[in-house]
């Protein structure tokens, strides 16, 4: 019925082109594929406007910069007289680690009460409430799961992590029981079949009902008990094998040993660090090996490195193929033709593997001429040294690409010239100003209270609307710490949801009777576990989206911490990308948590974040905030344009790689996985030969054994390509590619918000796209709509 949808999954990225020669590690260890906007290639110096903030907001705007850029200011701003802890995120249960277990126990009591209510429903009135009741049940469980999921990977206190993991396990086990509970499925089906019930449901309620119904179907709840038991066994085995595949993936050859003379062209300092007894010992799956493929002059040396870095161990491939076969069995058990058919039925715009195939083929056709042109450029570059050669070898691509890119690259001191214009506080100012222009919301620093945050470096920002007041809470843990993951991440710690008066009264009564429940000041706080809420104009109560952003930007430095944290342009893109997820959570404040925020179609979830990367490189947007931290001089935009041009070089070839990987994902989750002669290596090499312009991998290699994304994103890897195309289309159609300040116009932001962002997953995403793009061909979705999107392409014209 409901799943432990880890909202942290949004930070997972696909395999960027620079990583294709390395081991594919878990998706959360990957940065997204580079995606820079068309307008960024235009060289001009924009007029730098003053802040658009009204006088009332200018103090907030200045404070926003100061809390991130000036440590002394932050220490004074965040200081408090002490007192009793209010609990992590102001959750009254989480004042100490063992509070997590109490939180889980109380939540399970609430959940069982809701289950009993749903199972007892018999009247039309009771059936009308079933969707709301099941959504509340999901929210009760996800409050624990999402909070615990965040804490166990981010909190610096190991004991807190341990208790969070225990709480997560308690609730997840109960959720698995619910997923195979036939009574809940039957009651939902009865409600959906009764026209007197559905006649009063809103569009959002009907969408939630369909989502919950699909969740039940995918859990095999409608099957006889022995098949349900096998379903549970298979699910457990798939989880174990998937984890083993990711954790044990390894190359066939761990180290490549070469004479040091063979590595001419490589950074001599790095080569020297790896040299022992006149031989270079190069770890196969390392940054140094990837660097060698780009810079070593000797083609034979590059060939050895290429073979080693593209050949996974036989054990890795065996685990991969075992995982695919188990998924195929699970799909058959559940009544689906393949795992791809099973996976794409739930919260996916594509809806079927056939539609994904239409999209990928159309995209490949659009991209192929540009990819072939890029390969011709590489061959021409190779012929400068070897005039008689007729073809490129697989180990040539990175080397000659790097040769062509070098003149475009900002090198030496030039590479550091962008960072002084991007202090972290200034970038946060820019984001707030952009959101004010587009959506009428702003980021306001809020003094944290005792126990609210997990580290003194964490800043709390309240998201304020010009018309609706307080709409979300954003916690920013953006500075490097030794105990932190280096991966940028967005977590939805709590979703938006409307809370009824009856629910508040019930929880308030429980708080007075259950000794495990801490004291609360009011029914509203009791219903929100002490966390922040808002009262709507119609007097209803909504739990506010609570979001955490985690990055690893440098700490302020210099004498007396006078130099703020300065970001590279890459880090600016990263922050804009993650804030795109956050703004989706903020704007999609639905009445039901099942469809709130980023709980939309999986292949739509990356659209808002990918779109934000276009804003990060737009001249008018940068003109609003990018100034030198010492001189206050405006950013020379030509420097950004040069950076973008370098990143876009060989973009079509990079896209082609992604298309082939998405096709591989589809093929491995097709009915072929259940056949006796299933061979993942043959499938991968066949796709390269059929759809690749670049030279395919040579026989003997097995790169697919490094494709860790196959574990977590089975049959949905195409989503990143899909959202790249959609983001580019929205940028061009809605924001006019940033022309004449279109990226800052309120009417354009309102169009995006009202047509798409505010709905979360509560409306058919194809209807949202058709409305925002003004293209009715998309309204019904299906295979032809997927093919149409693919035909638009994702590689910008020069």
Question: Where are the model-predicted features located?
Answer:
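Alpha-helix N-cap/helix-initiation motif
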Residues: 316, 420, 424, 561-572, ...
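Active-site recognition of the HExxH zinc-binding catalytic motif
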Residues: 321, 328, 335, 435, ...
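Active-site-proximal, well-structured secondary-structure segments within enzyme catalytic domains
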Residues: 203-204, 208-210, 225, 232, ...
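C-terminal, non-catalytic "cap/extension" segments appended to globular domains
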Residues: 52-56, 60-96, 102, 430-443, ...
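C-terminal non-catalytic alpha-helical accessory regions
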Residues: 108-198, 656-699, 712, 739
């Amino acid at each position: 019925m409901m799943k432990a949808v880890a909202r942290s999954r949004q930070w997972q990225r696909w395999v960027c082109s620079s990583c294709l020669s390395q081991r594919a590690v878990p998706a959360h260890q990957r940065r997204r594929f580079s995606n820079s906007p068309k307008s960024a290639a235009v060289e001009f110096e924009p007029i730098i406007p003053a802040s658009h903030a009204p006088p009332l907001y200018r103090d907030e705007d200045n404070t926003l910069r100061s809390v991130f850029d000036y440590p002394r200011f932050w220490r004074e701003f965040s200081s408090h007289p002490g007192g009793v802890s209010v609990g992590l995120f102001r959750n009254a249960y989480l004042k100490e680690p063992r509070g997590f277990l109490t939180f889980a126990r109380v939540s399970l009591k609430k959940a069982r009460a809701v289950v009993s209510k749903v199972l007892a429903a018999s009247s039309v009135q009771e059936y009308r409430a079933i969707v709301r009741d099941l959504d509340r049940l999901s929210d009760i469980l996800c409050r624990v799961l999402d909070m615990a999921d965040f804490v166990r990977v981010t909190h610096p206190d190991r004991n807190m992590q341990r208790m969070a993991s225990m709480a997560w396990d308690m609730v997840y086990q109960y959720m698995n029981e619910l997923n195979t509970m036939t009574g809940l499925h039957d009651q939902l089906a009865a409600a959906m079949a009764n026209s007197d019930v559905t006649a009063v449901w809103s569009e959002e309620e009907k969408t939630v009902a369909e989502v919950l119904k699909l969740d039940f179907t995918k859990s095999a709840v409608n099957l006889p008990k022995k098949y349900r038991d096998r379903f549970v066994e298979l699910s457990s085995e798939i989880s174990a094998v998937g984890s083993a595949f990711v954790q044990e993936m390894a190359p066939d050859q761990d180290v490549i040993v070469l004479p040091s003379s063979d590595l001419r062209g490589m950074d001599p300092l790095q080569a020297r660090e790896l040299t022992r007894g006149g031989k270079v010992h190069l770890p196969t799956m390392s940054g140094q090996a990837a660097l060698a493929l780009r810079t070593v002059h000797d083609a034979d040396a590059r060939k050895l490195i290429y073979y080693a870095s593209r050949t996974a161990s036989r054990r890795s491939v065996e685990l991969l193929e075992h995982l695919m076969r188990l998924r195929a069995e699970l799909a058959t058990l559940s009544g689906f033709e393949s795992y791809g058919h099973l996976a794409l039925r739930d919260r996916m715009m594509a809806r079927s593997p056939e539609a994904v195939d239409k999209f990928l083929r159309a995209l490949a056709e659009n991209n192929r001429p540009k990819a072939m042109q890029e390969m011709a450029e590489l061959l021409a570059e190779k012929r400068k040294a070897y005039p008689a050669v007729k073809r490129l070898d697989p180990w040539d691509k990175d080397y000659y690409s790097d040769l062509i890119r070098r003149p475009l690259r900002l090198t030496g001191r030039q590479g550091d010239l962008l960072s002084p214009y991007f202090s972290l506080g200034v970038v946060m100012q820019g984001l707030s100003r952009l959101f004010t222009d587009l959506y009428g919301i702003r980021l306001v620093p809020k003094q944290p209270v005792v126990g609210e945050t997990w580290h003194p470096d964490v800043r709390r920002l309240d998201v304020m609307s010009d018309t609706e007041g307080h709409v979300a809470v954003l916690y920013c843990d953006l500075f490097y710490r030794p105990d932190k993951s280096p991966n940028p991440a967005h977590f939805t710690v709590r979703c938006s949801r409307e809370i009824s008066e009856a629910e508040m009264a019930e929880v308030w009564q429980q708080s007075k009777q259950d000794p495990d429940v801490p004291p609360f000041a009011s029914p509203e706080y009791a219903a929100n576990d002490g966390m922040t809420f808002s009262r709507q104009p119609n007097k209803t109560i909504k739990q506010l989206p609570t979001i955490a952003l985690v990055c690893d930007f440098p700490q302020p430095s210099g004498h007396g911490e006078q130099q703020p944290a300065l970001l590279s342009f890459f880090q600016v893109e990263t922050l804009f990308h993650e804030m795109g997820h956050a703004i989706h959570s903020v704007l999609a404040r639905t009445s039901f948590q099942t469809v709130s925020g980023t709980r939309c179609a999986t292949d739509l979830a990356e659209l808002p974040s990918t779109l934000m990367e276009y804003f990060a490189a737009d001249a008018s947007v940068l003109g609003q905030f990018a100034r030198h931290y010492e001189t206050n001089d405006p950013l020379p935009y030509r420097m950004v344009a040069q950076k973008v041009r370098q990143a876009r070089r060989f973009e079509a070839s990079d896209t082609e790689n992604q298309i082939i990987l998405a096709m591989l994902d589809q093929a491995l989750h097709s009915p072929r996985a259940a056949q006796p002669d299933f061979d993942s290596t043959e499938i991968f090499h066949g796709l390269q030969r059929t759809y690749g312009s670049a030279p395919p991998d040579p026989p003997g290699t097995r790169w697919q054994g490094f494709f860790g994304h196959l574990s977590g994103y089975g049959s949905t890897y195409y989503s990143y390509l899909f959202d790249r195309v959609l983001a580019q289309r929205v940028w061009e159609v809605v924001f006019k590619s940033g022309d004449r300040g279109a990226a800052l116009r309120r009417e354009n932001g309102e169009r995006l918000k009202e047509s798409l962002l505010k709905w979360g997953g509560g409306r058919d995403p194809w209807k949202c796209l058709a409305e925002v793009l003004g293209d009715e061909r998309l309204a019904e979705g299906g295979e032809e709509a997927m093919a149409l999107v693919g035909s638009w392409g994702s590689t910008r014209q020069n």
